[in-house]
Amino acid sequence: MSVIKLVDLDLKNKRVFIRSDLNVPVKEGKVTSDARITASMATINHCLKQGARVMVTSHLGRPEEGVWAMENSLQPVANDISRRLGTTVRLIKDWVDGGFEVAPGELVILENCRINKGEKKNLEETAKKYANLCDVFVMDAFGTAHRAEASTHGVAKYAPVACAGILLTEELDALTKALHQPARPLVAIVGGSKVSTKLTVLESLTEKVDQLVVGGGIANTFLKAAGNNVGKSLCEDELVPIAKSLMDKMNQRNATIPIAIDVVVGKKFAADEPAVLKEANAVSDDDMIFDIGPKSTQELVNIIMKAGTVVWNGPVGVFEFDQFGEGTHAIAKAIAETDAFTLAGGGDTIAAIQKYDIYDKVSYISTAGGAFLEFLEGKKLPAVEILELRAQ
């Protein structure tokens, strides 16, 4: 994938427009989780050091187009970045038509781009106005790279130069390394509640990986496809035939989808529900499967330890409740200890990484949700595609 890289450009005195992903949770005017801001600072700091005139925008929440509301304002983000830089960072509210100055080595935050008319529909008129503000457009929001919007795609068409920021470059390099040039065996762990939401990912991965580990509610559909009773567990009966065909497809290429041999069950979904260990073929009609058992867990740990590359998206049990979190905890520990190149992404996965404190032991953690999945599906991301075009 050849794109122009920000780090290769001379930015002195240039007007630089950065599209970051600063969509962070805010409570009572304060940022409650700043991981995305931290991830975006490398690009911002690089541009400031080079003496550029730096403008950064992002979406936050789901504002109504054309309507400014306090809860969708980037002001808390501007406050957070001001604190990091030790200087007051201005927030510019009405910026689309310009009319504001930025000094060399100064950073301004441009208010939530999703408030702008034409942003989500990627209107040419809006995109051209964005492009008029800058000499260099920097796409750094991998989290929205799968959406063609005016600030992620349209502006890249019309800006004098369109390049990939430091974070976007890192994300693309890590994903490419994991999926296009993987060290083998390549293992993917896909958890989550429904097969239907991850079906295209599962279909795409069955063509690439050596072992496809399914977890969470998804695993129940595969357990049933393998002939087991899953009781009252979350299970998509209508997708059992598809689960069967994916298992067959993997077998034909001497690859496997390991099926749990023991499980941890409860009668209801509750924090104080006692955990009961059962063989996978002994689940009763009123049981609900909430985790994998120790034998299955050990099998997965062995797979991870022998892997060359591990891609992790989604927990294997209800890890929010500790009694149903043993499987996910053991997998997290194995991912932290394996010599494999490890790549993790998705909200629940990051929550598990934080809970089990292995953040600095994963080779690469993707900040993106949907874009991460679409990359796993083998889809072209529109925001990356336009950067590739502009690099020609």
Curated annotation (Swiss-Prot):
GO terms for cellular component: cytosol. Belongs to the phosphoglycerate kinase family. The keyword Phosphoprotein does not apply. This is Phosphoglycerate kinase. InterPro entries: Phosphoglycerate_kinase, Phosphoglycerate_kinase_CS, Phosphoglycerate_kinase_N, Phosphoglycerate_kinase_sf. The gene is pgk. PROSITE patterns: PGLYCERATE_KINASE. GO terms for molecular function: ADP binding; ATP binding; phosphoglycerate kinase activity.
